[in-house]
Amino acid sequence: MKLVEIAEDILSKANAYTNNTGLTSSQRFQLREEIRYQANGILSAIDGPEQTMKAIARSYTTCTALKVCVDLKLASHLPLSDARSLSQLAQICGCDSLVLRPMLRLLAKNGIFEQVDAETWQHTELSAVMAQPPFQALEEKYRSVAHLPRLLQAVSHQFPTPGRTAFNQVYCTSLDFYTYSNELDHAAARNFAFSMKELARNQIPFVQQSYPLETIDPESHFIDVAGGVGYLSFFLAGSFPKATFEVQDHPFIIEEAHSVCPSELRDRITFRAHNILHPQPEIAKEINGRLVFLVKIILHDHGDDDCRLMLRNLVSVMKQGDRILIIDTVIPETGGSLSSANSDIIIMSMFGSGHRTLEEFRALIHRCGEDLVIETFASGDEEYDGMMVIEVRKAEPVLDN
């Protein structure tokens, strides 16, 4: 397709996307992906395939410039509503202006920071995002992904295994990221935990749209497995005013969780230090409601063996009527979002695991050695990056005639 034809097609789709006339969430997602794909097609049409491939191959330089500016906390040192000279920024950041200048020049080509004149720089909408918590949790991901090609060469391009990942080599440890950060790098653990707030907030509409929450006993006891500081439980507590919650995670994160729990929820939410690979603690005798185990964005960070162990630990304490709600990305057999494709590489680098298809999830759950019933809920899956809610229950006993 010629350049003008691509541009005209994008304009037509952009108008449909902006006007949102009668589009379902799935159609909006598909339209967005087509616009993004064709926008890249414009660059290819302008530069030609050889130059386009060179630009893609050199994109690691943009990541490097971004990482340097994150290390310097540049986004925080530059006021959102004002501009600063290069020399001022270099002095505030404690770096050489000759180091900072090429970083800013390259990022500005991507809309990250803006050069006002020969000496002065200011924020853009993109660069302002760098001051937010999720961007403070990129250190381990950046270093691990950068090391992945070398690791794969060393293992003859076989899939990495837990304990022998790019993260493990970079940080000279056999511990997984969560154990390592909670035991040895509390700043990393804290940054990661607090970066999950917006993710949890954005997932609540998806859960409400996709899963019939009204089928849950209003006096249920929710157990938020590896739940970080408890953001998902905080949000769900508003929908279940009679329910109780227990948030489980590593000891350091649980200490942090106490400080951020809303005061009005402290009589209904408890926190427990617990390793998800260990058997579930005994349920308190005063807990009479149905159990609902929340497993949100957990399984994709673990290999099949560990996932089966986690699920068996949950199933072993379940009774009829209890349920597990797995909230995770489920990749399609073809296609899928750019976001999930990116995170698949990150997960391989960090954990030696990856996203799963629905059939892979089903096989994983059924190999837990129990007679389990699986239902999937995904009415908004494409809009929410392929997310699904997978409900797991014990099968009803078959009565003899």
UniProtKB/Swiss-Prot annotation:
SUPFAM superfamilies, per the entry: S-adenosyl-L-methionine-dependent methyltransferases (SSF53335), Winged helix' DNA-binding domain (SSF46785)
Note: Trichothecenes are sesquiterpenoid toxins that act by inhibiting protein biosynthesis.
GO biological process, one term: methylation
Residue positions binding S-adenosyl-L-methionine: D249
InterPro entries for the chain: COMT-like (IPR016461), O_MeTrfase_dom (IPR001077), Plant_O-MeTrfase_dimerisation (IPR012967), SAM-dependent_MTases_sf (IPR029063), WH-like_DNA-bd_sf (IPR036388), WH_DNA-bd_sf (IPR036390)
EC number: 2.1.1.-
Active-site residues (renumbered): H300 (proton acceptor)
Family: Belongs to the class I-like SAM-binding methyltransferase superfamily. Cation-independent O-methyltransferase family.
Presence of the UniProt keyword Methyltransferase in the record: yes
Function: O-methyltransferase; part of the satratoxin SC3 cluster involved in the biosynthesis of satratoxins, trichothecene mycotoxins that are associated with human food poisonings. Satratoxins are suggested to be made by products of multiple gene clusters (SC1, SC2 and SC3) that encode 21 proteins in all, including polyketide synthases, acetyltransferases, and other enzymes expected to modify the trichothecene skeleton. SC1 encodes 10 proteins, SAT1 to SAT10.
A GO term, aspect molecular function: O-methyltransferase activity
Pathway terms, separated by semicolons: Mycotoxin biosynthesis
Classification via Gene3D superfamilies: Vaccinia Virus protein VP39, Winged helix-like DNA-binding domain superfamily/Winged helix DNA-binding domain
UniProtKB keywords: Methyltransferase, S-adenosyl-L-methionine, Transferase
Keyword hit for Cell division: no
Protein name: O-methyltransferase SAT18
EC supergroup of this enzyme: transferase
Pfam families: Dimerisation, Methyltransf_2
Chain's gene name: SAT18
